[in-house]
Amino acid sequence: MKLTAEDKHNVKAIWDHVKGHEEAIGAEALYRMFCCMPTTRIYFPAKDLSERSSYLHSHGKKVVGALTNAVAHIDDIDTAFSKLSDKHAEELMVDPANFPKLAHNILVVLGIHLKPHFTYSVHRSVDKFLSTVAYVLASKYR
């Protein structure tokens, strides 16, 4: 899915509001995913995935940090996510069907917390961006 100039502008603009809140946004998105889609928990055996766990917050910060990197390299997400895609495919062996699930939950959290800035056009652009990231992450599985 090709991001238009407007999409790129919208994603960068909304991401300015994400900065400084990476941990909270990431943790809430992960927690929502684990609660609503419990099969996604299988990749985190013996980890505390409760809402306030330090592991969940640390991993959430890492996830949103990776997305911040994708925003910074929005014209070449393939290259920016190449190593991360390799890791998820070869080392972690995460089912690529889970990437869109997390993308959906990130979209929900952004919509809740950034409501005044999360217009319909921003929603569409961020959805396309997260879908692109999910596609790139799954690309090494082929």
From Swiss-Prot:
PROSITE patterns in the record: GLOBIN (PS01033)
Pfam families cross-referenced by the UniProt entry: Globin
Binding site residues for heme b: H88
Domain Globin: 2-142
Keyword annotations from UniProtKB, A to Z: Heme, Iron, Metal-binding, Oxygen transport, Transport
InterPro entries: Globin, Globin-like_sf, Globin/Proto, Hemoglobin_a-typ, Hemoglobin_oxygen_transport
Gene Ontology molecular-function annotations: haptoglobin binding; heme binding; metal ion binding; organic acid binding; oxygen binding; oxygen carrier activity; peroxidase activity
Residues where O2 binds: H59
Tissue occurrence: Red blood cells.
Biological processes, Gene Ontology terms: hydrogen peroxide catabolic process
Protein task: Involved in oxygen transport from the lung to the various peripheral tissues.
Subunit comment: Major hemoglobin is a heterotetramer of two alpha-1 chains and two beta-1 chains.
Family in the record: Belongs to the globin family.
Protein name: Hemoglobin subunit alpha-1
Source species: Pleurodeles waltl
